[in-house]
């Protein structure tokens, strides 16, 4: 049976990767080690923001602050940042990471770029 009060083992990791996925409706922040194993992940809805408040820059800032506390407990000091998406929360999440006194080695934008995929449906005639 799952016991919510059991504490995870503390890993001593110095290098990590932060994934910031910013959509028009939500923001998801994930801290991983260099192999990609997730250490901490949160979204605006998981913290308690509802509806349109999930897509605010303030929500992204709060997410980064909460997730970085867990990352600091695991010993992460140096980060590589990977940003995905086109939401308005990108910049505030980045500023919040810089305010947490991490050493940032690189910032990469991994947003997908369309290369004119499927043909759109025909225009409606009314």
Swiss-Prot record:
It holds the Pfam family Ribosomal_S11. The keyword RNA-binding applies. GO terms for biological process: translation. Gene3D superfamilies: Ribosomal protein S11. Keywords: Ribonucleoprotein, Ribosomal protein, RNA-binding, rRNA-binding. GO terms for molecular function: rRNA binding; structural constituent of ribosome. The keyword Ribonucleoprotein applies. GO terms for cellular component: ribonucleoprotein complex; ribosome. Located on the platform of the 30S subunit, it bridges several disparate RNA helices of the 16S rRNA. Forms part of the Shine-Dalgarno cleft in the 70S ribosome. Part of the 30S ribosomal subunit. Interacts with proteins S7 and S18. Binds to IF-3. Belongs to the universal ribosomal protein uS11 family. This is Small ribosomal subunit protein uS11. The gene is rpsK.
């Amino acid at each position: 049976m799952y016991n919510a009060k059991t504490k995870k083992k503390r890993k001593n990791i110095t290098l990590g990767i932060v994934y910031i996925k910013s959509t028009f409706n939500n923001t998801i922040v994930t801290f991983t080690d260099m192999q990609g194993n997730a250490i901490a992940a949160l979204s605006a809805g998981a913290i308690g923001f509802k509806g349109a408040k999930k897509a605010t820059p303030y929500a992204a800032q709060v997410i980064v602050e909460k997730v970085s506390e867990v990352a600091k407990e695991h010993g992460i000091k140096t980060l590589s940042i990977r940003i995905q998406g086109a939401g308005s929360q990108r910049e505030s999440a980045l500023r919040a990471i810089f305010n947490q006194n991490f050493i940032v080695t690189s910032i990469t934008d991994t947003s997908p770029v369309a290369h004119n995929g499927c043909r759109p449906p025909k225009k409606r005639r009314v």
